[in-house]
Swiss-Prot record:
It comes from Listeria monocytogenes serotype 4a (strain HCC23). Pathway: Amino-sugar metabolism; N-acetylneuraminate degradation; D-fructose 6-phosphate from N-acetylneuraminate: step 5/5. SUPFAM superfamilies: NagB/RpiA/CoA transferase-like. Catalyzes the reversible isomerization-deamination of glucosamine 6-phosphate (GlcN6P) to form fructose 6-phosphate (Fru6P) and ammonium ion. It holds the Pfam family Glucosamine_iso. GO terms for biological process: carbohydrate metabolic process; glucosamine catabolic process; N-acetylglucosamine catabolic process; N-acetylneuraminate catabolic process. It comes from the Bacteria. This is Glucosamine-6-phosphate deaminase. One of its GO terms (molecular function) is identical protein binding. The keyword Hydrolase applies.
Length: 234
């Protein structure tokens, strides 16, 4: 596990972009795994501004809310289109289908996509409770793409994106921890003091399902990029 501490979110995002750009230009990265939320927003803005040619790169996304259409402003389809896909050309892009009515079939469909497009670099954020994707504490390390019941803390953290608290979805489709660990390389981004405890448990704590991100200690190629605040407890 390589640890990089930077001055702020912008510097950390630029460092992540350097790694991604190197992988794409060398031809090593054909599939890029993407995350959502506030953490990767600056990375995507920097990628859009860059000269990195992504037209031969396929993208996959970690998760999507159950029940939200792709054109719903709160969906992750919409988020990705607004921040990246409408501004940068990719070969093709895949996300779970939030409107799928058969959860088991949708999870199997997405796993098939992941097997056809092995992830070369997976970008991750981390929740204050150590979740990666929507894999909440207690999730099996052997989990594949699955339908998740969102915890109160995760819904609380995400309610700022919704007009009303009751509009925050209760379920999501998420790549499982095993699905994430299948990526050849992982870049974990964390910025801000509120992520410091989760980062401490991820890097220095035991590998335990109560901190899902701690499983990254078992991955052969992980780069953790932090700002000074997120690194403050290390």
């Amino acid at each position: 596990m390589q640890l990089i501490t930077t001055e702020n979110k912008l510097a950390g995002s630029k460092k992540a972009l350097e790694i991604i750009e190197k992988g794409i230009t060398s031809g090593e990265v054909n599939t890029l795994g993407l995350a959502t939320g506030s953490t990767p927003e600056t990375l995507y803005a920097e990628l859009v501004k860059s000269d990195v040619d992504t037209k031969n790169v396929t993208t996959t996304n970690l998760d999507e809310y159950v029940g939200l259409a792709a054109n719903d402003p709160n969906s992750y389809h919409y988020y990705m289109n607004e921040l990246l896909f409408s501004k940068k050309a990719f070969k093709e892009s895949f996300l779970p289908n939030g409107e799928a009515t058969d959860a088991e079939a949708e999870c199997a469909r997405y796993e098939e996509i992941l097997s056809e497009h092995p992830i070369d670099i997976q970008v991750l954020g981390i929740g204050t409770n150590g979740h990666i994707g929507f894999n909440e504490p207690g999730t099996s390390f052997d989990s594949l793409t699955h339908k998740v019941v969102l915890t109160d803390s995760t819904r609380e953290a995400n309610k700022r994106f919704f007009e009303r608290e009751e509009d925050v979805p209760t379920h999501a489709y998420s790549m499982g921890i095993k699905s994430i660990m299948n990526a050849k390389k992982i870049i974990l981004l964390a910025f801000g003091e509120n992520k410091a405890q989760a980062i401490k448990e991820t890097i220095k704590g035991p590998v335990d399902v109560n901190c899902p991100a701690s499983v990254l200690q078992n991955h052969p190629d992980v780069t953790v990029i932090l700002d000074n605040e997120a690194a403050s407890l290390l």
